[in-house]
């Protein structure tokens, strides 16, 4: 079977793990959850740093652990790259020495590829003490890649960095899955990192899998509600760039074969695939098509579902799921007053309104 299969049972402290997980054979699979949910424990089991009481771990056709068959491949033979929260560089080696440390068979072409991908050339003769946090993490990622791993495990690699350093490293992480066709398992507690990087999402809570699947589906599921506040609820779209406005700094993206959206200008070629977030708070609903309005996006839709939500004991909001096409949906958040005034019900034809300026660069990621 292709991909990464993780199945194990284990008790660690107060957390009882019962994991059954199938992850894709390439791309970025994010593991998300609150502190103490067991995210790092899962990748430690995959790497062999932790041995479960029972279970099976397999990568494609390679069985790494099987408690029934008595298989437990040692850590150093699993051919796994691991990037920790802290870079763990050797202080007495310069960057080039750190990159080459542990490389079984030096490959000059691969070395040049990794150095170019992570923009490490200016750093090669410098020592870790002179590097910024972001530079150290880029070196750590490079070292892991140069071990020619069959899978890359990343344990919150940006958690120790401040915001400017995170912004420095994120573009390099975005290139990883395009440049190396290996599965990348990425542990994080950051919704922004998931938006920018992930193709697949697993939500974990106290050692149990709450949801796992394609990012756009899990993102809109009940499993994500505890982490999405009233203002953070949103819809994710896999879209592509269709048009650059000839006069204004706006880009039209296709959400489906017929539904499109004008957003702030995206500097990428026509046809580029992107991931795009539309916040439910930025979507309003009208029963008739407006005329002479400043809102650039007016999309005909059908009411698919109406849900009452309680972000706090004394607060209530209404989530409306709108069908733009048969398999393309958009969430809108409105007030109970608006619901009563519009008398919305399933099957109603309406118009969704989204400001062109509401979708910004932080809501968009190129997916190559």
UniProtKB/Swiss-Prot annotation:
The keyword Lipid metabolism does not apply. The keyword Secreted does not apply. It is found in: Cell inner membrane. Residues 292-363 form the Mop domain. PROSITE patterns: ABC_TRANSPORTER_1, ABC_TRANSPORTER_2, MODC, MOP. It catalyses: molybdate(out) + ATP + H2O = molybdate(in) + ADP + phosphate + H(+). One of its GO terms (molecular function) is ATP binding. InterPro entries: AAA+_ATPase (IPR003593), ABC_transporter-like_ATP-bd (IPR003439), ABC_transporter-like_CS (IPR017871), Mo/tungstate-bd_C_term_dom (IPR008995), ModC_ABC_ATP-bd (IPR011868), Molybdenum_import_ModC (IPR050334), Mop_domain (IPR004606), P-loop_NTPase (IPR027417). It comes from the Bacteria. One of its GO terms (cellular component) is plasma membrane. Keywords: ATP-binding, Cell inner membrane, Cell membrane, Membrane, Molybdenum, Nucleotide-binding, Translocase, Transport. Gene3D superfamilies: 2.40.50.100, P-loop containing nucleotide triphosphate hydrolases. Its EC number is 7.3.2.5. Belongs to the ABC transporter superfamily. Molybdate importer (TC 3.A.1.8) family. Part of the ABC transporter complex ModABC involved in molybdenum import. Responsible for energy coupling to the transport system. The complex is composed of two ATP-binding proteins (ModC), two transmembrane proteins (ModB) and a solute-binding protein (ModA). This is Molybdenum import ATP-binding protein ModC.
């Amino acid at each position: 079977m292709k991909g990464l299969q993780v199945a194990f049972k284990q008790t660690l402290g107060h957390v009882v793990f019962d994991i059954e997980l199938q992850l894709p054979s390439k791309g970025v699979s994010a593991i998300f959850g609150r502190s103490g949910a067991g995210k790092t424990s899962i990748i430690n089991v995959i790497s062999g740093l932790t041995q479960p009481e029972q279970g099976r771990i397999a990568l494609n056709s390679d069985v790494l652990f099987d408690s029934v068959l008595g298989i437990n491949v040692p850590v150093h033979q699993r051919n796994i790259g691991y990037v920790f929260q802290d870079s763990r560089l050797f202080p007495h080696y310069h960057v080039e020495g750190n990159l080459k440390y542990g490389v079984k068979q030096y490959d000059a072409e691969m070395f040049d590829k990794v150095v170019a991908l992570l923009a490490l050339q200016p750093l090669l003769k410098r020592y870790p003490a002179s590097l910024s946090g972001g530079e150290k993490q880029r070196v750590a990622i490079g070292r892991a890649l140069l071990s020619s791993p069959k899978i890359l495990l990343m344990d919150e690699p940006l958690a120790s960095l401040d915001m400017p350093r995170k912004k420095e490293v994120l573009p390099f992480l975005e290139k990883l899955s395009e440049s190396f066709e290996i599965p990348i398992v990425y542990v994080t507690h950051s919704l922004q990192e998931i938006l920018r990087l992930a193709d697949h999402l697993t939500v974990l809570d106290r050692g149990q899998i709450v949801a796992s699947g394609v990012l756009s589906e899990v993102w809109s599921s009940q499993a994500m509600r505890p982490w999405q506040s009233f203002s953070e609820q949103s819809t994710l779209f896999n879209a592509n760039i269709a048009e650059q406005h000839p006069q204004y700094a706006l880009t039209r993206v296709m959400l489906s074969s017929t539904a499109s959206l004008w957003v702030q200008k995206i500097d990428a070629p026509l046809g580029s695939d992107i991931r795009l977030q539309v916040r439910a708070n930025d979507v309003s609903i009208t029963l008739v098509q407006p005329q002479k309005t400043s809102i650039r996006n007016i999309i005909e839709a059908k009411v698919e579902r109406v849900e009452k939500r309680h972000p706090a004991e004394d607060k209530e909001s209404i989530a409306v799921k709108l069908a733009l096409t048969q398999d393309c949906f958009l969430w809108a958040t409105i007030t109970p007053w608006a619901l009563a005034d519009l008398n919305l019900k399933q099957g109603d034809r309406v118009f969704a309104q989204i400001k062109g300026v509401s979708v910004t660069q932080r809501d968009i990621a190129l997916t190559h």
